[in-house]
């Protein structure tokens, strides 16, 4: 895998520069609450907080821990953009760990959609609308790369 197929140097720089501003203020807990609002059945995929009432999720230690782990993987993916082989290995491994949940391409499409909307809503507005549009366009191939590799690995048939 060559990340250059997905992101050029400028896009990589924009993703890395904007990420700290996007991820602040409980991004990952908000991601999961937005995901579960959109698709309530997805919460059932998480054994440790499958039956926690929605209103109590943000105070549930297992929910918070999973949110932190997701953030760690995403941060690592951003850090490894210039080392595509390492990035690919980490994403494939993560996808393989998700095979047991029998997720479908649709699950991953919903995740990508929720992430895209959240990132677009949090893009820094300094620099005006042209800069915001440039940032949004830089994030699209990154999300396609990350979610796509995880999905391909998670949905692969293992012989």
Residue ranges and their predicted role:
Residues 1-159:
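Globin-like tetrapyrrole-binding proteins
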